[in-house]
Amino acid sequence: MTTLTAQQIACVYAWLAQLFSRELDDEQLTQIASAQMAEWFSLLKSEPPLTAAVNGLENSIATLTVRDDARLELAADFCGLFLMTDKQAALPYASAYKQDEQEIKRLLVEAGMETSGNFNEPADHLAIYLELLSHLHFSLGEGTVPARRIDGLRQKTLTALRQWLPEFVARCHQYDRFGFYAALSQLLQVLVECDNQKG
């Protein structure tokens, strides 16, 4: 990625972590359709690989704003996709895709982080991977820890996430009736691939 700073990438990961960790409330719903968010999206679209995914997300947000009871409908989508059995869902856990659920714990220890007691989900939840990537990008931007060490950890985290993210995204596309979370997961996948190519 060329135009986005480490801090901006960190913000995108943190934002995605938040949206995948819990249902949207009214305030978040208003925020994603705001002019401020449109500016943020236009900044992301200045990164060519992200353009199509951001356009897709904006389209799903535009459709969302005309839905009756949008928040309740979206909550139902969230629940059906991420909290039910895995038969017709896209469970956001590494272990649901036969990956080592301990790997993220090792990466968190290496980064000097731990999961928050406020987040009542297993450590291998997608949001934890994204929070870790956000933290690492912020650290890269600050320059207080040697970049090589942070970069190595970022690469390990991306490698672990890329083991199961494509299947998660495919399941979002398959089972998300409305398409908001499918579009969100598509943006995440493109971001992760761009981040990975950064080396």
From Swiss-Prot:
A GO cellular component annotation in the UniProt record: cytoplasm
Q: Where is the signal peptide?
A: none
The GO annotation for biological process reads: protein complex oligomerization; protein folding
Entry coiled-coil feature ranges: none
What keywords is this UniProt entry annotated with?
A: Chaperone, Cytoplasm
Domain of life of the organism encoding this protein: Bacteria
Q: Where is this protein found?
A: Cytoplasm
List the transmembrane segments. none
Name the family: Belongs to the TorD/DmsD family. TorD subfamily.
Which HAMAP family does this entry report, sorted A to Z?
Answer: TorD
The protein's job, in short, is:
Involved in the biogenesis of TorA. Acts on TorA before the insertion of the molybdenum cofactor and, as a result, probably favors a conformation of the apoenzyme that is competent for acquiring the cofactor.
What name is this protein filed under? Chaperone protein TorD
- Taxonomic lineage per UniProt? Bacteria, Pseudomonadati, Pseudomonadota, Gammaproteobacteria, Enterobacterales
